[in-house]
């Protein structure tokens, strides 16, 4: 990990390597805050598992998963004259990447909860399913749901 200050300026987090964004996103929920070495280890194990299961380059799998699970449009709340209605908006590329990484790590975290499988195995499964675009990935399901809501509010 680079220990870089990617939050200091507006678009600087776009320069952050995608694997590190994934690692940083894993450090969520109070008890895991700041435990970056733990997150690095999880990502490393997940990459090894991906390589064993698919024989593909794990970084390519991560990139495909992020591309497939980033929602293309979203519904935002627009309030005018006391009436709040949802309006469909396109999502900027940077937010697509951030949202995709968030959905992937959330899916891995939820599937690892109260489960024998380690979070590394769950993360590997989530990434492989999302890279394939299969609907038993949490991130793909959420993305479809977000886009369906946006389509209804066009």
From Swiss-Prot:
List the source organism.
Nicotiana plumbaginifolia
Q: Which GO terms describe its biological process?
A: translation
Gene3D superfamilies recorded: Ribosomal protein S7 domain
Identification of the protein by name? Small ribosomal subunit protein uS7
One GO MF annotation is:
RNA binding
UniProt cross-references to Pfam families, sorted A to Z: Ribosomal_S7 (PF00177)
Concerning CDD domains, the annotation shows: uS7_Eukaryote
State the family named in the UniProt similarity comment for this chain. Answer: Belongs to the universal ribosomal protein uS7 family.
User: PROSITE patterns in the record, alphabetically?
Assistant: RIBOSOMAL_S7
Q: What InterPro entries is this protein classified in?
A: Ribosomal_uS7, Ribosomal_uS7_CS, Ribosomal_uS7_dom, Ribosomal_uS7_dom_sf, Ribosomal_uS7_euk/arc
Record keywords: Ribonucleoprotein, Ribosomal protein
Any GO CC annotation of this UniProt entry: small ribosomal subunit
């Amino acid at each position: 990990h680079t220990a870089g200050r990617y939050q200091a300026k507006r678009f600087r987090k776009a320069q952050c390597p995608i694997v590190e964004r994934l690692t940083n996103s894993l450090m969520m929920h109070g008890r895991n805050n700041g435990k970056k070495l733990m997150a690095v280890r999880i990502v490393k194990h997940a990459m090894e598992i991906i390589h064993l299961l698919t024989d593909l380059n794990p970084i390519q799998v991560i990139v495909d998963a992020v591309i497939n699970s980033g929602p293309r449009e979203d519904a935002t709340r627009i309030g005018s004259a006391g009436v709040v209605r949802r309006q469909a908006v396109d999502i900027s590329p940077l937010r697509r990447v951030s949202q995709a990484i968030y959905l992937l790590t959330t899916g891995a975290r939820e599937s690892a909860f109260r489960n024998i499988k380690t979070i590394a195995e769950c993360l590997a499964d989530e990434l492989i399913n999302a890279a394939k675009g299969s609907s038993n990935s949490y991130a793909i399901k959420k993305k479809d749901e977000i886009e369906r809501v946006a389509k209804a509010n066009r």
